[in-house]
Regions:
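Flexible domain-boundary/linker segments
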Residues: 261, 339, 390-391, 439, ...
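Short loop or secondary-structure boundary microenvironments that flank
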Residues: 359, 363, 405, 433, ...
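Conserved ATP-driven motor cores of ASCE-family P-loop NTPases powering translocation/secretion/packaging/pilus
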Residues: 419-521
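P-loop NTPase motor domains
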Residues: 23-26, 134-427, 442, 452, ...
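A broad, low-specificity signal for short, low-complexity segments enriched in glycine/proline
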Residues: 96-105, 114-115, 120-130, 150-151, ...
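Basic- and hydrophobic-enriched, low-structure N-terminal and domain-boundary segments
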Residues: 1-146, 150-152, 477, 488-489, ...
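Short secondary-structure boundary/capping segments
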Residues: 180-182, 205-206, 445-449, 473-478, ...
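Extended alpha-helical interface modules used as scaffolds for assembling large macromolecular complexes
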Residues: 505, 544-547
């Protein structure tokens, strides 16, 4: 209900009604002076009403007008006071179904059809959030087989708007979308945690001491099993953060770029065996001792000294805990994958790029790397937007995170706050879930805050009652008329009918369960809900370039970073990071076939490449 708007309308109507009432009062005053008896008064009134120009001012006119001006507003006030809490036809609720056609007209970008999100078969959503005053964060809920990828992720990816980050279970999106994105000029990068292809080195993005500490915190907290109690292990976790952050800070400031990786970090931990004999120093202690003599206030030294405050046996336990946090880097493939970096995360906000993170759908062991990438991506993009005056706080290229398998990848600790403020940086998140229960499990008491920061919710179907119940509740109630009939039998039989109003959920939980497979439910902030057809992927003009319509699948290129050194983003400006081109692929392919001509085998040329020459 909108009482303020309705009340203003009523006041205007009553004010307009006052004009004919004043005319009638003046006419009645004239008639009572000119005529005697009811019949003559009626005749004079009839003449005045037929010929308004006959109306004259007379001695009693002020009295009649004053009576109207006093009693009419009083009567209106009493009537409105009596009706203030009554809403005829809306006693139990005003929920109603909206129109997909009307939503489309209101929210689509009419100037450029490509600058739209695809929500349903008939609803488009402009990427210009300032025009429609809605954020671009979207929650997509659908059970297994409901078509989250086919009916939502793929159509929106084929719009080719800005930069994308895809969480890609099994690599389906990479195979389907990689080729068309490269064809359309979008740089494609793949981090494959199934086959251990691609390279991502979190240490390449360290720029401040705080970055190093946040990375250590992310390592410790995201490599723990989900069912690990949070309170009991806090001391060991904090101590591990101290040690790991000290080592990261040392590598960040003192080690060459080629050694700034997790393999070196693990090697340093393995060389930090604490002896009961205080006279015996391990190699790591000697390394930090030499650094302390050079710079007693070095941030790495301060962190390491804080770690060394513990008793010897306690330090041994902390070392074991830290090694357990990094045990996966003993794997040769995993160590190789994180030894260099080719993600170039800040550039996603500067040019169109697509980053595919391929995850195993049956094993979450290595998913924590995606969590660290999430954390660093948000940090890098926020820093880029906030620290570059000409961007005015918003990235020049929109960055969209298609977060499939949302519940299976740990999120940055402050994700709720990130979701609330990412709109102003020209970043949006598509949270893709199987049901509401997953969201409740992840965020406990804060799960409603996640939904609150998403102005659009799209339900594709499922088989979980809690989701049905939640959707039925937020759809609201409608007021409907009911008819009851009573019939009395016997020698003096009688019958009676009565009409009443009753409240009913706009859509009951069982009705949501019975939605057709080709239908979806769309809820947008400040709009009536809509049931519409799911978008048909084969209707998209770009689908012809994908395997879904007979196109060639994307094949991951050769390891073009295999013979290169690490490119540290802290030392290379984001806007000038080296461009990876097809020519480079061809050159590396040639060098593999002709190793005797490999220019980069020369150590001097390696150094030149590292300096960007």
């Amino acid at each position: 209900m909108r009482p303020n708007k309705d009340r203003r309308t009523e006041i205007i109507l009553y004010g307009l009604l006052l004009i004919p009432l004043l005319f009638a009062a003046a006419a009645l005053a004239q008639a009572t002076e000119q005529a005697q008896g009811l019949a003559e008064i009626t005749a004079v009134l009839s003449e005045i009403l037929h010929t308004p120009s006959m109306l004259r001012w007379c001695a009693s006119t002020p009295k009649f007008l004053l009576a109207v001006l006093v009693f009419y507003p009083l009567a209106v006030y009493c009537y409105m006071l009596d009706q203030a809490d009554r809403h005829p036809g809306a006693e139990h609720g005003t929920a109603k179904w909206g129109s997909a056609h009307r939503l489309n007209i209101k929210y689509r970008n009419t100037k450029d059809s490509k600058e739209n999100y695809i929500l349903t078969e008939n609803v488009r959503f402009s990427t210009d959030s300032h025009a429609h005053k809605h954020n671009l964060n979207i929650i997509v809920i659908g059970g297994s087989g409901s078509g989250k990828t086919r009916f939502y992720v793929k159509p929106n990816a084929l719009q080719l708007i800005g930069s994308y980050l895809f969480l890609d279970p099994k690599g389906e999106l990479t195979r389907t979308l990689g080729r068309i994105m490269e064809t359309k000029g979008i740089s494609v990068t793949v981090l494959d945690l199934v086959h251990f292809q691609g390279h991502y080195n979190p240490m390449a993005y360290l720029e401040t001491d705080e970055d190093a500490i946040k990375l250590a915190f992310a390592i410790v907290n995201n490599t723990k099993p989900k069912d690990t109690p949070s309170g009991g292990d806090k001391f060991w976790d904090d101590s591990s953060v101290l040690l790991i952050s000290a080592l990261i800070l040392y590598l960040m400031y003192e080690a060459p770029a080629s050694e700034q990786n997790f393999s070196t970090l693990m090697y340093m931990i393995l060389n930090c065996q604490v002896s009961e004999n205080e006279m015996v120093e391990n190699p790591l202690m000697m390394l930090f001792g030499e650094l302390e003599r050079r710079d007693p206030q070095h941030p790495a030294v301060l962190q390491f000294k804080s770690f060394m405050l513990g008793a010897k046996k306690t330090l041994q336990s902390i070392l074991i805990s830290a090694a357990a946090n990094l045990y996966m880097f003993n794997s040769r493939k995993y160590a190789e994958m994180t030894s260099r970096d080719e993600m170039f995360l800040p550039r996603m906000g500067l040019e169109q790029r697509a980053l595919f993170i391929v995850l195993p759908d049956n094993d979450t062991t290595f998913n924590f790397i995606a969590t660290m990438l999430y954390t660093q991506l948000f940090d890098q993009l926020f820093r880029l937007a906030d620290s570059t005056p000409e961007y005015n706080g918003a990235l020049p290229v929109h960055v969209r995170l298609m977060m499939d398998e949302f519940a299976n990848v740990a999120l940055p600790k402050n994700f709720k706050n990130i979701l609330a403020v990412c709109r102003s940086r020209n970043i949006s998140c598509d949270i893709i879930l199987q049901n509401i229960a997953q969201l409740k499990s992840l965020f406990k008491d804060d799960w409603e805050g996640i939904i609150g920061n998403c102005d659009t919710l799209l339900y594709l179907g499922g088989n979980e009652y809690g989701t049905y119940e939640y959707l039925s509740k937020i759809l609201g109630k409608e007021t409907e008329r009911t008819k009851s009939q009573s019939i009395g039998k016997g020698s003096r039989g009688s019958s009676s009918d009565s009409l009443q109003t009753a409240g009913r959920e706009l859509c009951m939980p069982d009705e949501i369960r019975r939605m057709r497979d080709d239908e979806c439910l769309l809820l947008m902030r400040s709009e009536d809900p809509v049931i519409d057809k799911k978008y048909n992927l084969l209707h998209h003009p770009n689908v012809k370039y994908t395997p879904d319509a007979g196109g060639e699948p994307y094949v991951m290129p050769p390891d073009y970073m295999g013979d290169a050194v690490t490119i540290t983003m802290g030392a290379v400006a984001a806007a000038t990071a080296p461009e990876i081109t097809e020519e480079m692929y061809e050159q590396l392919d040639y060098l593999e076939k002709h190793p005797e001509e490999n220019y980069y085998k020369n150590e001097e040329n390696f150094s030149q490449y590292d300096q960007g020459d």
